[in-house]
Amino acid sequence: MATVRKAFPQRLVGLASLRAASTSSMGTLPKRVKIVEVGPRDGLQNEKSIVPTPVKIKLIDMLSEAGLPVIEATSFVSPKWVPQMADHSDVLKGIQKFPGINYPVLTPNMKGFEEAVAAGAKEVSIFGAASELFTRKNVNCSIEESFQRFDGVMQAARAASISVRGYVSCALGCPYEGKVSPAKVAEVAKKLYSMGCYEISLGDTIGVGTPGLMKDMLTAVLHEVPVAALAVHCHDTYGQALANTLVALQMGVSVVDSSVAGLGGCPYAKGASGNLATEDLVYMLTGLGIHTGVNLQKLLEAGDFICQALNRKTSSKVAQATCKL
């Protein structure tokens, strides 16, 4: 019978040897990666039970303590559509604002933007999609009409010197249309970039992407948008999130979205499971010798906290492997 070895106090005994491994055969990799933590927004928005505001605030504060440079705090959407985000103003006002850390919020329209600014937002995000049917089911308009709705937000943001990040949903597949053309993703990304979004996050909303699809999609997008303005946002429905992210890194992308404990999904995407777990991403990047500035131990503690609060198990493989037995 095999014996079970308890985790060592540092919990992560393999990282030193991983860092020593050669990465010369993996192509050029960035020296540092900016991680955009989306757990408090994308991770929690689909939870069936309403998460208490103090829990959300503590989670964000713990993520700040862990050194995440960007933490998407909440979403200024209608409580009718996403009840979990009804406390958006209280959350944004209640968190500790750490120096050097950005706390963007999702603002789908002018009303949301105005409420976000009133609550102290310094950066906002808008959502586009590369799927016509997804856009209609999500926001009840065409892709072109969705851009028209963003015009007011972009103008107001420029006037207030507020940065805007753009998302492209369904970049590697759609729950309604199936395959999505890389050319369509490139077209939507180019439009968001030309409108003034400083960064475009390409999302595999339902997690159907593979490394080959990621390569083809990024190849098309890179003809329209500078690599420095791109990020990837992978869901792990088919267990491909880390592999897809690694392909993006090899192609020059140095910004990656992820969610603590692998929380999240998409309320409009049937079958979508959680996001790429931030713990797993940090572990991989550290093993590749890529700087993140994130304290993995503190990140694991944040994951433990929110999983206990939600009464659920973590989706992070690293957290599962290093838990106290």
UniProtKB/Swiss-Prot annotation:
Residues 1-27 form a transit peptide. InterPro entries: Aldolase_TIM (IPR013785), HMG_CoA_lyase_AS (IPR000138), HMGL (IPR043594), PYR_CT (IPR000891). The keyword Mitochondrion applies. CDD domains: DRE_TIM_HMGL. A motif (Microbody targeting signal) lies at residues 323-325. It is an enzyme of class 4 (lyase). It is found in: Mitochondrion matrix; Peroxisome. A divalent metal cation binds at residues 42, 233, 235, 275. Substrate binds at residue 41. One of its GO terms (biological process) is response to fatty acid. The keyword Lipid metabolism applies. One of its GO terms (molecular function) is magnesium ion binding. The modification N6-succinyllysine is found at residues 48, 137, 179. The modification N6-acetyllysine is found at residues 48, 111, 137, 179, 324. In suckling rat, highest levels in liver and in intestine. Lower levels in heart, kidney and cerebellum. Weak expression in brain cortex, medulla and midbrain. Levels decrease slightly during weaning. The active site is at 266. It holds the Pfam family HMGL-like. Residues 33-300 form the Pyruvate carboxyltransferase domain. Signal peptide: none annotated. Keywords: Acetylation, Disulfide bond, Lipid metabolism, Lyase, Metal-binding, Mitochondrion, Peroxisome, Transit peptide. Coiled coil: none annotated. Belongs to the HMG-CoA lyase family. Homodimer; disulfide-linked. Can also form homotetramers. Mitochondrial 3-hydroxy-3-methylglutaryl-CoA lyase that catalyzes a cation-dependent cleavage of (S)-3-hydroxy-3-methylglutaryl-CoA into acetyl-CoA and acetoacetate, a key step in ketogenesis. Terminal step in leucine catabolism. Ketone bodies (beta-hydroxybutyrate, acetoacetate and acetone) are essential as an alternative source of energy to glucose, as lipid precursors and as regulators of metabolism. This is Hydroxymethylglutaryl-CoA lyase, mitochondrial. The gene is Hmgcl.
